[in-house]
C-alpha cells in the first residue's frame, strides 16, 4: 500500500495509529513492570509523609534527610531508616545499575539480565525485548514517517510477544513476592503461571477491543454492569 493511502485513507490511517499507539503504550508499561519487579527484591515498601515509596527510591531518601536536618523526632528511628535505605540502594545500584551514569537504560538492561539469571526469561527473549525497544524508539521519534510507511503484521507479532512476556513476569512476581507476603494459596486447579494481574487483564482487553473486533461485546458487558449498579442504587 502506498504512503498516500497510509496517510489519507481513513481506515488504513486509523489502523496504523492504533497499532503505533498501543505498541508504545504496552512497551512503556512493560519496561515499568520489569524494573519495578526486580526493585522489589532489593527494597521494601515505606510510607513517609503519607506517601508510599520503595526504600531505595531517591525521593524517599531525600525526604528522610530533610526530616533529620529539620530535627524531627524520633530522630534515631529516622537515622536508622536512612542508613538502611542507603545500604539497600547501594546494593541495588551495584548489582543492577553498575557504574554507568545512564540509570534509566542501565535499570532496564540490568533488570532483564537479573530476570534471565533467575530463569524468568531466556537469552533469546532478552534479545527480542531490545529489538522491540528499538522499534518503539523508531515509532516514538519518527512516528509520521512510520505511519506513512505503514505498520504491519510484524508489529502486531511484537505486541503479542510482549504481552505474553509481561504476563509471565507478572505471574512470576505474584508467585515469588505477593503470595508469600500475603500468605495466599491458590486453589489446586489454578496454576501459578496462569495468574493474570489487573494491568495484564486491562491491556489484553484493550488488545481484543482494538484488534480482535470485540468492542461490541465489551460495550454490551459494560452496559449490563452499569444497569445492575443503577438498579442497586435505586433500591
Identify the residue ranges that each predicted region occupies.
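Acidic, low-complexity proline/glycine-rich segments
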Residues: 97-100
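Short glycine-centered helix-capping/turn motifs at secondary-structure transition points
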Residues: 119-122
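Polyanionic, low-complexity intrinsically disordered segments
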Residues: 1-92, 109, 113, 124-127, ...
Amino acid at each position: 500500500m502506498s504512503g498516500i493511502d497510509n496517510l489519507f485513507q481513513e481506515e488504513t490511517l486509523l489502523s496504523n495509529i492504533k497499532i503505533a499507539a498501543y505498541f508504545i503504550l504496552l512497551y512503556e508499561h512493560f519496561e515499568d513492570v520489569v524494573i519495578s519487579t526486580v526493585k522489589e527484591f532489593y527494597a521494601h515498601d515505606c510510607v513517609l509523609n503519607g506517601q508510599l515509596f520503595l526504600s531505595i527510591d531517591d525521593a524517599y531518601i531525600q525526604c528522610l534527610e530533610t526530616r533529620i536536618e529539620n530535627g524531627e523526632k524520633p530522630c534515631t528511628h529516622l537515622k536508622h531508616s536512612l542508613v538502611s535505605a542507603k545500604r539497600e540502594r547501594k546494593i541495588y545500584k551495584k548489582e543492577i545499575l553498575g557504574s554507568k551514569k545512564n540509570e534509566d537504560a542501565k535499570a532496564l538492561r540490568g533488570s532483564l539480565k537479573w530476570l534471565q539469571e533467575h530463569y524468568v526469561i531466556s537469552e533469546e527473549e532478552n534479545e527480542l525485548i531490545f529489538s522491540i525497544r528499538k522499534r518503539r524508539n523508531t515509532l516514538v521519534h519518527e512516528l509520521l514517517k512510520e505511519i506513512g510507511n505503514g505498520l504491519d503484521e510484524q508489529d502486531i507479532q511484537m505486541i503479542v510477544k510482549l504481552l505474553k512476556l509481561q504476563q509471565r513476569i507478572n505471574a512470576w512476581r505474584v508467585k515469588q513476592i505477593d503470595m508469600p507476603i500475603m500468605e495466599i494459596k491458590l486453589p489446586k486447579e489454578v496454576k501459578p503461571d496462569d495468574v493474570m494481574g489487573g494491568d495484564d487483564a486491562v491491556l489484553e482487553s484493550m488488545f481484543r477491543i482494538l484488534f480482535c473486533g470485540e468492542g461490541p461485546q465489551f460495550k454490551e458487558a459494560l452496559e449490563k454492569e452499569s444497569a445492575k449498579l443503577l438498579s442497586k442504587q435505586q433500591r
